[in-house]
């Protein structure tokens, strides 16, 4: 709510403004608000108040008869269908309408999956579409490496994503991409891998930041050690797997987590390293 003095939540209070861009608006507004259970600010006079219910209703209303979503409303698109699932995932277990919509969307994504485990959007098989599906599945607790609905001819979405990886540490947009790495593809591929890692490590989903310790809480828990830290170390536990080590004004936060990787291509493993 305070980024260089700017309240990022304030524009999201105006429902009409949020919806003006299209279905992307309600989807990512809901994701943003739910990322840390933010309270929606009061809309200014004359504006339509945003509520979580209104955002959910807008997303559900845009679902197509084939079970998916698309920006232009003409047939399910893998990216938009996956993004809609990501936004609705927190309500899957508590809202019957959401559950029904998401179940239909999962069926559509399963049918849309290519024989190599990948996805095509706007006529092109690409890394970003695969990445969005991975994030959608993990947001529901579905392991894309093992769920049979999303494995075609032995290939999972993770296998498909790995085919876009290059030896420079990045990802290309499509197989015909002549650039060494594509910025958007690399960004989305890595946060998709992060979402899978978080699932395997038993952590919250990618956009669920309820496990984040805010700086104010860290400061409140800080233990200032005025003695010899080598002889008299002090630690203040912040959360499971995290510790705040204090020695005078030097402090560090360390987090460690390990997962056992399932069967996947070497390229996908390398991308996680």
Language-model region placement:
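Terminal, non-catalytic domain-edge segments
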Residues: 160, 177-239, 245
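Extended intrinsically disordered, low-complexity coil regions enriched in Ser, Thr, Gly, Ala
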Residues: 152-156
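Acidic helix/loop microenvironments that form the catalytic cleft of cell-wall polysaccharide enzymes
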Residues: 159-166
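Solvent-exposed, low-complexity, repeat-rich "mucin-like" stalks and linkers
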Residues: 223-272
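An alpha-helical repeat/solenoid feature that recognizes helix-turn-helix modules
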Residues: 1-3, 17-48, 52, 57, ...
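Eukaryotic RNA-binding helical-repeat scaffolds
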Residues: 8-17
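Extracellular cell-wall/glycan-interacting regions and their flexible linkers
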Residues: 100, 158, 270-271
């Amino acid at each position: 709510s305070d980024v260089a003095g700017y309240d990022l939540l304030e524009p999201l209070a105006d429902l009409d403004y949020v919806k003006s861009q299209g279905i992307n608006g309600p989807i990512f507004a809901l994701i943003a608000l739910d990322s840390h259970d933010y309270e929606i600010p009061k809309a200014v006079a004359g504006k339509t108040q945003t509520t979580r219910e209104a955002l959910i209703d807008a997303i559900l209303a845009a679902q197509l008869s084939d079970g998916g979503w698309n920006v232009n409303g003409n047939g399910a698109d893998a990216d938009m269908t996956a993004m809609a699932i990501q936004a609705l995932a927190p309500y899957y277990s508590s809202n019957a309408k959401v559950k029904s919509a998401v179940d239909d969307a999962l069926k559509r994504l399963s049918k849309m999956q290519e024989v190599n485990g990948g996805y095509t959007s706007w006529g092109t098989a690409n890394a970003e579409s695969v990445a969005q599906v991975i994030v959608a599945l993990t947001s529901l607790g579905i392991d894309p490496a093992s769920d049979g609905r999303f494995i075609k001819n032995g290939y999972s979405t993770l296998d498909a994503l790995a085919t876009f990886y290059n030896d420079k540490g990045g990802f290309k947009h499509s197989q015909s991409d002549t650039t060494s790495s594509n910025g958007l593809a690399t960004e989305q591929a890595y946060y998709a891998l992060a979402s899978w890692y978080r699932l395997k490590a038993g952590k919250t989903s990618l956009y669920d930041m309820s496990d984040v310790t805010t700086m104010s809480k860290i400061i409140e828990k800080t233990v200032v050690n005025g003695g010899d830290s080598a002889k008299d170390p002090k630690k203040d536990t912040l959360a499971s797997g995290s510790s705040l080590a204090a020695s005078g004004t030097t402090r560090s936060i360390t987090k460690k987590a390990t997962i056992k990787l399932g069967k996947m291509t070497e390229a996908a493993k390398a991308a996680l390293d």
